[in-house]
Amino acid sequence: MDNLGHRENGRQRPDQYKGLHTQWMMPQTQRHLKDHQSMNLLALMNDRDNAIRERDHALAEKKAAIAERDMAFTQRDAAMAERNAAVVERDNALAALELARTNGLNMNNGNGFPQGSLSGSKNIHHHDQLSHAQSSPLQLADSPYDHAREMHISEAYPISTAPGSAGKAKRPKKNSSQASPLKRPSGVLRKTKKPSGDWKNVGMSGCGDDSAHASVMKNEWKDQNLGLNQVAFDDSTMPAPACSCTGKLRQCYKWGNGGWQSSCCTMNISMYPLPVMPNKRHARMGGRKMSGGAFTKLLSRLAAEGHDLSTPVDLKDHWAKHGTNRYITIR
């Protein structure tokens, strides 16, 4: 047949048809691969959308947290401002209390009277007591000039004065013998001492009630606390005193009745601890000392000057100038 191949080329037609058909008809395996890729793409897009939504949610939470943080900062600033105002008020109150305390130290126990006026009145009362207490001894001493009192005493008690006069009459005979010149001063002394004893007897016999009253008043005056602002040491509220002669505060030891002894210095050396005595076991050199009365006076003076007694008192410049005991045991 002709070249069109209706019969002769009958075998080639199926091949041409087959070749043309394979261009448009995909194999089954390729179709499955393409579907798998599209499914993967869809899954990736879904994951991306989920990630974007999570990011947006996280950003929203972050913004809310930032807003809460700013609110907390605002509250913190307000609290700090209130605290600063409270601190200022506290400082003002402490300053007012300190001023009132210093003014109270200059007053007599807060009675509203100046210290000078009350101390003056106290001194006047003290002088009155002293004058009353010493009135009878002064009158006895000035009795040669008070003839009326001498006559009154001699008339009231003639029996007590009679032996004295008899003794006076006999003594000139002993002095006129002049046994030795060395005995003469002793006789003179006895002669001068005897009238004083007679005057004592007269005073005690004639003014017994006055002298007893004067002695009682004198004892009461001794027992009184003469210091208006005297401060006594209290272990419960005041710390023990210390000494800073070595450059650091070292607590002192108790000594005697209310006194204190240094633990780091003597009259010649200053070191802590004090050296051990070579000729006495378990004993160190004795430090400088301060008696209880001197320490009480020091506390009173420091309190009057406005010193804070809640802190340890430095005794570096207040020790006694006298020597110390040779040994003291510190264990």
From Swiss-Prot:
A molecular function (GO) held by this record is: sequence-specific DNA binding
Coiled coil stretches, renumbered: 43-101
GO CC, one annotated term: nucleus
Region: Alanine-zipper, residue numbers:
51-86
Q: Name one GO biological process term.
A: response to ethylene
Q: Which Pfam families match?
A: GAGA_bind (PF06217)
The listed locations are: Nucleus
Annotated InterPro entries: GAGA-bd_tscrpt_act
Q: Quick one: where's region Disordered?
A: 104-140, 156-205
Q: Which family does it belong to?
A: Belongs to the BBR/BPC family.
**What does the record note on quaternary structure?**
Homodimer. Heterodimer.
Instruction: Relay the domain remarks.
Output: Alanine-zipper domain is involved in homo- or hetero-dimerization via electrostatic interaction.
Q: What does this protein do?
A: Transcriptional regulator that specifically binds to GA-rich elements (GAGA-repeats) present in regulatory sequences of genes involved in developmental processes.
Protein name, as recorded? Barley B recombinant-like protein D
State the species of origin.
Oryza sativa subsp. japonica (Rice)
